[in-house]
């Protein structure tokens, strides 16, 4: 297992280097002079020259890339042009907010999706099977922004059950050390604020997790049906084992392997694709952070944000690969 993990880690090195090349090249793909694009058409030649010197844009490409990699090796993502603050310090609260939202959304998607898929396969062609697969089809097809707006209208505006915006109560803000509000409030014993944080997570979490939930449900059903029709399951049934034992002890473990792939991909997609949900719910996440940087032409932030999200996506897929080898020891490639 350790040797397999080391091989997978070594294979990540060229992938990560490739990502740095792509993210670094973004600023060089801007038509015209990048410094003038950042400062605007009315900028003076001296201001443009000063910014080129500050960003190192007057150096050859390979020299700039070498300096960029040197900074990355020391944990320096650069400085925001808009706030003039180190990006490494500035980006974490936004990233933590998106991580917390993504975790909640995926917990919702996995619990509902996996169990719906299992029962649908177990009760194939029943009313539950047809209903759950219809809901899954609607979930895959439903626009996130429409679902988010309906949630706000029904549960926040009409019923008043849940908050529609933000991460916490602005009148009683949460003092966080890690940026993960639920974790921090549990550790500090502020359970009233824990519930407040969870209430703020419910609507955006469901909106963000609906599509992954539908995909996971359909994949789980398909995988379970394939496993339930295999020879070894027929043997287990012939021995008189109960349906619960057959499903959860013998079939589920093998059926989860393709589902893990979907979970890994969807988790990575949510991290980088939550911008619409974050905008509708005023969630201060990494998607909104990058979007605001695009509006302000803050290219160092754009580079760093894309690199961080891409790196997390790759690490999630590494984790899924390691889970494969744990669930099925035959997978050693």
Swiss-Prot record:
Family, similarity comment: Belongs to the binding-protein-dependent transport system permease family. OppBC subfamily.
* One term under GO cellular component: plasma membrane
**Residue ranges of domain ABC transmembrane type-1 in the record:** 95-324
Question: Which BP terms from GO are recorded?
Answer: peptide transport; protein transport; transmembrane transport
Q: Which organism is it from?
A: Alkalihalophilus pseudofirmus (strain ATCC BAA-2126 / JCM 17055 / OF4) (Bacillus pseudofirmus)
Membrane topology term: Multi-pass membrane protein
The gene that this protein is the product of is dppB
What this chain does, per the entry, is described as: Probably part of the ABC transporter Dpp involved in dipeptide transport. Responsible for the translocation of the substrate across the membrane.
Q: Which PANTHER family match?
A: DIPEPTIDE TRANSPORT SYSTEM PERMEASE PROTEIN DPPB-RELATED
| Chain segments annotated as transmembrane | 10-30, 99-119, 130-150, 197-217, 256-276, 300-320
Question: Where in the cell is the protein located?
Answer: Cell membrane
- The molecule here is called Dipeptide transport system permease protein DppB
- Where is the signal peptide, in residue numbers? none
Q: Fetch the InterPro entries from UniProt.
A: BPD_transp_1_N, MetI-like, MetI-like_sf
> What Pfam families does the record point to?
BPD_transp_1 (PF00528), BPD_transp_1_N (PF19300)
């Amino acid at each position: 297992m350790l040797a397999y993990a080391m091989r997978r880690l070594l294979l990540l090195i060229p992938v990560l280097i490739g990502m740095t090349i792509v993210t670094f090249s973004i600023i060089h793909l801007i038509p015209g002079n990048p410094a003038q694009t950042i400062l605007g058409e009315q900028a003076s030649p001296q201001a443009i020259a000063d910014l080129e010197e500050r960003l190192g844009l007057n150096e050859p490409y390979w020299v700039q890339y070498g300096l960029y990699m040197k900074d990355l090796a020391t944990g320096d993502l650069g400085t925001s042009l808009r706030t003039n603050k180190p990006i490494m310090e500035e980006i974490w609260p936004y990233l933590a907010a998106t991580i917390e939202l993504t975790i909640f959304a995926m917990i919702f998607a996995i619990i509902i999706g996996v169990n719906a898929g299992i029962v649908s396969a177990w009760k194939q062609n029943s009313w539950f099977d047809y209903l759950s697969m219809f809901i899954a089809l609607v979930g895959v097809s439903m626009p996130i922004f429409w679902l988010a707006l309906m949630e706000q209208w029904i549960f926040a505006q009409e019923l008043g059950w849940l908050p529609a915006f933000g991460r916490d109560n602005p009148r009683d803000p949460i003092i966080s050390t890690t940026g993960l509000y639920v974790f921090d409030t549990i550790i500090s014993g502020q359970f009233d604020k824990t519930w407040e944080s969870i209430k703020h997570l419910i609507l955006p979490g469901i909106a963000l997790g609906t599509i992954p939930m539908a995909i996971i449900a359909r994949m789980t059903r398909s995988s379970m049906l394939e496993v339930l029709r295999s020879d070894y399951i027929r043997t287990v049934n012939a021995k008189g084992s109960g349906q619960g034992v057959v499903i959860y002890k013998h079939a589920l473990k093998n059926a989860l392997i393709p589902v893990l792939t979907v979970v890994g991909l969807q988790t990575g997609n949510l991290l980088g694709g939550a911008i619409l949900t974050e905008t509708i719910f005023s969630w201060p996440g990494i998607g909104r952070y990058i979007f605001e940087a695009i509006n302000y032409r803050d290219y160092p932030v754009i580079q760093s944000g894309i690199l961080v999200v891409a790196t997390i996506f790759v690490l999630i897929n590494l984790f899924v690969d390691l889970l494969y080898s744990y669930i099925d020891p035959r997978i050693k490639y």
